[in-house]
């Protein structure tokens, strides 16, 4: 069971980062993966107003916001074409549409679960993540790091982070 004492919709990444430095506070996405834990959250930090819910295509690849849902990944025609349908296939078997409408890319990557089809897919694509304070890091390196209090903002495919 998860208990939340306070809720705060962050107005900036800096505000979200500052709030997240206090140990009992947590960043919220779709909350699917947090529900798997028995935790007490001091302040639940909502990133939904920060524009991290978009997928942008450039000549180099894609930038994917941490608040993009798995359903958005599944339905994005550009990502489907870029990966020859692999992204769509990697998420379409994850529980049901209702869960994919809630679960976020950020939560799926940040939690680094061994069972994560999303993490596996983006590792295969040599993706990178952008952390608010930590900058751009290869996903393979990030997946090996211990958890910290930084905020995962974006995921980049191949050269899109350059």
Segments (PLM) and residue ranges:
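C-terminal structural segment of proteins
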Residues: 1-158
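Conserved PLP-anchoring active-site segment centered on the Schiff-base-forming lysine
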Residues: 161
């Amino acid at each position: 069971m998860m208990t939340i004492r306070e809720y705060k919709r962050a107005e900036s990444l800096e505000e979200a980062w500052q709030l997240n430095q206090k140990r009992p506070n947590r960043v919220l996405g779709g909350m699917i993966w947090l529900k798997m834990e028995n935790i007490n959250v001091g302040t639940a930090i909502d990133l939904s107003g920060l524009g991290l819910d978009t997928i942008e295509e450039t000549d180099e690849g894609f930038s994917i916001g941490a608040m993009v849902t798995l359903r958005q990944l599944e339905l994005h025609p550009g990502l489907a074409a870029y990966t020859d349908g692999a992204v769509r296939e990697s998420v379409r078997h994850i529980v049901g549409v209702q869960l994919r409408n809630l679960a976020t890319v950020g939560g799926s990557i940040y939690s680094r679960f061994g069972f994560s089809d999303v993490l596996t897919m983006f590792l295969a694509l040599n993706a990178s993540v952008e952390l608010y304070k930590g900058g751009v890091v290869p996903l393979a390196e990030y997946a090996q790091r211990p958890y910290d209090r930084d905020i995962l903002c974006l995921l980049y495919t191949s050269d899109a982070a350059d």
